[in-house]
Design a protein with these regions (language model features):
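Serine-centered coil/turn micro-motif
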Residues: 17, 108, 210-211
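Short glycine/proline-enriched coil/turn segments at helix->beta-strand junctions
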Residues: 28-33, 155-156
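A conserved beta-strand-loop-helix scaffold within acyl/acetyltransferase catalytic domains
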Residues: 1-8, 12, 103-179
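A conserved mid-domain beta-alpha-beta active-site/ligand-binding segment of alpha/beta enzyme cores
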Residues: 79-106, 130
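Active-site/acyl-donor-binding loops of N-acyltransferases
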Residues: 34-90, 142, 148, 160-259
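Conserved acetyl-CoA-binding loop-helix of GNAT-fold acetyltransferases
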Residues: 10-30, 181-194
Length: 259
């Protein structure tokens, strides 16, 4: 087990008095295994205390209609330009294969049944998060914006997504898994094709896979600053290789959401 280190700050008038070190030592007593996704400033401090960092997991973004990111052009409602952009992007991902699309609220049982028999990672080179059906229900069915959560299914591969509007129409891919052979890249391609046809402006995901470069341009990739510490040298060696997390495991998706 481990605890998630969020952050801490020292007020300006108390800086230089060693309080940060004292706070950290007290925090370390809570649990011998600690992890964090942190800012550059926090990482700089944590590394002084022996934390290891890893940048394998990336925040992935694919703009479909860049015009909607420019307020002036967005207000002009350039429908022709929008259709043209989607047409050229669609040529790369066009497919006649249908992908099943469900609203989570009315179809949770389908997702829950597949989640129960999903294939779990057998890679012992990096740490993973233990997820079960109770976690799935809590994360999705008790989510304040569950009305905006959906999932796709393709060849027994599933993708839980969050579709909402904040300045632009977004599709956040929260979590993917399979119950049989993995077709993750194909799943992402079909989701991209669906997004183009349904007026989505931007795709977003968090993933450590290097097999999605045909979908997410490298220029928009942003490595997550993962850091970890453990009093056990063997555990720290594993944590040094990073954590297998996806968008559903962070608060980034929730921070983007506006009710």
């Amino acid at each position: 087990s481990a605890i998630w280190f969020v952050d801490y700050a020292i007020l300006p008038e108390f800086k230089g008095k060693g309080l940060g070190k004292i706070m950290y030592k007290e925090w370390s007593k809570i649990c011998s295994n600690q992890m964090a996704i942190c800012s550059v400033d926090s990482l700089r401090v944590l590394k002084k205390f022996g934390w290891e960092d890893n940048y394998a997991v990336k925040r992935l973004t694919k703009p479909i209609n860049p015009l909607n990111f420019l307020p002036i052009l967005k207000n002009l409602k350039l429908n022709f330009a929008n259709k043209a952009l989607r047409y050229f992007v669609k040529k790369k991902y066009s497919s006649t294969v249908s992908i099943n699309f469900y609203q989570i609220n009315d179809n949770f049982k389908i997702l829950n049944d597949s989640f129960r028999i999903r294939k779990k990672s057998t890679n012992n080179n990096y740490a993973t998060i233990i997820r079960d059906e109770k976690w799935l229900h809590w994360r999705l069915m008790e989510c304040p914006y569950k009305r905006d959560i959906y999932f796709f299914e393709y060849k027994n591969n599933f993708a839980i997504v969050h579709i909402f509007f904040k300045n632009v129409k977004r599709l956040n891919i929260l979590y993917t898994y399979s119950t049989d052979i993995s077709y993750e890249n194909e799943l992402y391609c079909h989701i991209t094709n669906w997004a183009i046809n349904n007026d989505i402006d931007v795709l977003w995901a968090i993933n450590r896979s290097n097999d999605l470069r045909n979908i997410f341009p490298k220029i928009f990739n942003n490595p997550l600053k993962f850091a970890a510490w453990s009093s056990d040298a063997k555990i720290l060696k594993v944590l040094k290789n990073g954590l297998d997390i996806q968008g559903i495991d962070t608060d980034t998706d929730s921070c983007l959401y506006v009710d």
